[in-house]
């Protein structure tokens, strides 16, 4: 009887250990699969970050040109020198309001699966989250404000009053000079210029965070010691 009980206990223990080992192996395989998928997630996020760095540099350059044109116009219309209408119109034509909206698809996909938070290192998660949940969201808000200010100043005010001159139609120099030297125009220009300057600051801050995230992603991928990952980094 004792032998039967002992044998039964051993069999039960063997079954229990077998189930436990099987569960452990399945969990180990699942974790490895998720980590491999995270590598692909990070590759995709890095591709998005690279594209965003290229785009944000172009937007920064464009807004620097716009800010310089604003400064030129303000200097001309507030000086005592004779206003050269053709010159100021050339600067007015440079005024637009280009905005930046980052690519978020790869980050959102990885975040929705939980892989990023579960398997990536803490610093990488922190900086990626900061980029998308802080810098991009703040920049989206500023982009929308910039759009509204630009629309009001350029489309609804400048274009409405002297659009004909900007488009090359005949104009009276006196009418154009009166428009540019009016205090209303100067105030609107100062408001627009201030918005350009503020938006440029947000762009530069976001670019700095993009560069930080890019470096961390490259370091993380390289640390996986997988030849396909290293080759992807090398030739991307």
Predicted segments — roles?
Residues 1-2, 6, 27-236:
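Long, hydrophobic alpha-helical segments that serve as membrane-spanning/inserting helices
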């Amino acid at each position: 009887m004792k032998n039967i009980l002992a044998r039964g206990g051993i069999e039960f223990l063997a079954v229990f250990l077998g189930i436990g080992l099987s569960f452990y192996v399945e969990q180990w395989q699942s974790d490895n699969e998720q980590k491999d998928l995270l590598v692909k997630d990070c590759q995709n996020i890095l591709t998005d970050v690279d594209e965003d760095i290229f785009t944000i540099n172009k937007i920064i350059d464009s807004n620097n040109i716009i800010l310089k044109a604003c400064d030129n116009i303000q200097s001309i219309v507030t000086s005592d020198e004779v206003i050269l209408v053709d010159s100021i119109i050339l600067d007015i034509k440079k005024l637009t309001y280009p905005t930046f909206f980052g690519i978020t698809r790869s980050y959102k996909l990885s975040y929705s699966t939980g892989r990023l938070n579960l398997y990536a290192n803490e610093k990488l998660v922190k900086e990626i989250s900061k980029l998308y949940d802080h810098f991009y969201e703040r920049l989206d808000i500023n982009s929308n404000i910039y759009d509204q200010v630009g629309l009001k100043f350029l489309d609804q005010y400048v274009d409405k009053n002297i659009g004909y001159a900007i488009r090359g139609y005949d104009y009276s120099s006196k009418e154009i000079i009166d428009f540019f030297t009016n205090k209303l125009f100067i105030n609107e220009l100062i408001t627009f210029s201030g918005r350009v300057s503020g938006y440029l600051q947000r762009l530069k801050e976001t670019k700095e965070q993009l560069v930080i995230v890019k470096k961390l992603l490259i370091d993380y991928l390289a640390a996986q010691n997988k030849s396909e990952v290293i080759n992807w980094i090398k030739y991307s």
